[in-house]
Structures are given as structure tokens and as C-alpha cells.
Design a protein with these regions (language model features):
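Conserved active-site beta-strand element of glycosyltransferases/polysaccharide synthases
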Residues: 103
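Cyclic nucleotide-binding regulatory module and flanking cytosolic helices
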Residues: 1-32, 77, 82-85
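A small-molecule sensor/coupling module
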Residues: 109-150
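Short, leucine-enriched amphipathic alpha-helices that occur as contiguous helical runs
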Residues: 76, 148-152, 186
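Phosphate-/nucleic-acid-contacting segments
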Residues: 160-191
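Short amphipathic alpha-helical elements of helix-turn-helix/winged-helix folds
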Residues: 154-158
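Cyclic nucleotide-binding regulatory domains
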Residues: 9, 34-98
Length: 191
């Protein structure tokens, strides 16, 4: 089954690939605001998000300002995943929007395991493409809506990724508000 394409949100991996990553990764926890990946760098970890949200941004090389591309929620990759198949050498920074738990995974080991199963190999090779589509859809929304529309869309998409069942409450008769399970920092919302 192809991954769900949602603007601003990195695609989630299949359940079978998630089990593989759980078997070969080691857990790490980060606090809100922690920078967990910067490129170019000497070392970069491939990470699988178990809980929380990670902001993924390109850096403007002239001003060192981030351009929000997407967010990785539970079930998505972050960190040095671009080097699995894409080597564009664009400077990037990933930081935690909320308290986050990730699994740090050895890239070479993951690729060797994926070579044993054509479905996993296809999933990993297509991950960068689907991520690019999500990023570009988010950039389109950045330029097509008002600030209020963009913020509302971002919060709804985050709610959809974190708690899909809560989305049903939005369309229930008589419900005037739905509590968000997270609170993005002002800097991320401002971008």
C-alpha cells in the first residue's frame, strides 16, 4: 500500500518496515527544541520517529534561516535519510517540535536487510520521492493561503498524524472545539 501523501508531513513507513527498524535501532529521547540533525556534517544518523514531531528544514546558505519543508511524526524517518538515495548536498537542520523519541538506525545495515525483501527495497527507494511530494505540497500551501488558513491546516494535519481518531470529533454534531495533544513553539508557527 502506498504511503499517505499529506502536505508538510513526512510519509509513514509500513508496519513491516517499522518492525525491522525496531529490531535494529536503539532508542534515544530528545526534548523540545533540541537540534537532532544538521547537514553538512561529519556524522549523521538515520532516525525513525516513534513519538513526537521533528521539524525538517532547508537552510538558506546566505542568512542561515530555516525554510520549513516538512515534519516527521510517528512512523516517519528523519535525520540523514536523504543520503539513502538522494545526495543533493543541500544544508538541512532537523529539530524537535515536541518531546520526541527516535530509533537511531545504521543505514548500511538497513539497506542490506531491505535488499532481502523487494517490497522493503521499493519502499525505501520511493521514500525520498514521496517526501519530496509532501514537501512541495506544503510549500504550495505556504504561498496560497492566508496566515490563519495555513496555521489551521498545519494544526489539523498534525492532529491527523498524531491522533487520527480525534479528527472524527471535528465533524461530530455539537462539538465546538477539539483539544490538541501538542503545542508547537512560537518560532515554528511563525515560519
Amino acid at each position: 500500500m502506498p504511503p499517505e501523501v499529506i502536505p508538510w508531513m513526512s510519509p509513514c513507513l509500513s508496519q513491516s518496515m517499522s518492525f525491522v527498524l525496531a529490531g535494529i535501532g536503539h532508542p534515544m529521547k530528545f526534548r523540545r527544541g533540541d537540534v537532532i540533525y544538521t547537514s553538512p556534517g561529519l556524522f549523521g544518523n538515520l532516525m525513525y520517529v516513534r513519538s513526537g514531531f521533528v521539524v525538517k528544514a532547508l537552510l538558506d546558505p546566505v542568512r542561515d534561516e530555516p525554510l520549513l519543508l516538512s515534519m516527521a511524526g510517528p512512523g516517519a524517518l528523519c535525520g540523514n535519510y536523504e543520503n539513502l538515495y538522494v545526495r543533493d548536498r543541500m544544508p538541512r537542520r532537523h529539530w524537535c517540535l515536541t518531546s520526541t523519541e527516535v530509533l537511531v538506525v545504521n543505514q548500511e545495515l538497513l539497506l542490506k536487510i531491505a535488499d532481502q525483501n523487494p517490497e522493503w527495497q521499493h519502499e525505501l527507494s520511493g521514500y525520498s520521492s514521496v517526501s519530496s511530494i509532501c514537501d512541495r505540497m506544503g510549500m504550495f500551501l505556504n504561498y496560497s493561503g492566508t496566515v490563519e488558513e495555513r496555521l489551521g491546516a498545519l494544526l489539523l494535519l498534525m492532529l491527523h498524524c498524531e491522533e487520527p481518531a480525534a479528527m472524527a470529533n471535528l465533524f461530530s454534531k455539537g462539538v465546538e472545539w477539539v483539544e490538541l495533544p501538542f503545542y508547537p513553539d512560537k518560532g515554528t508557527i511563525a515560519r
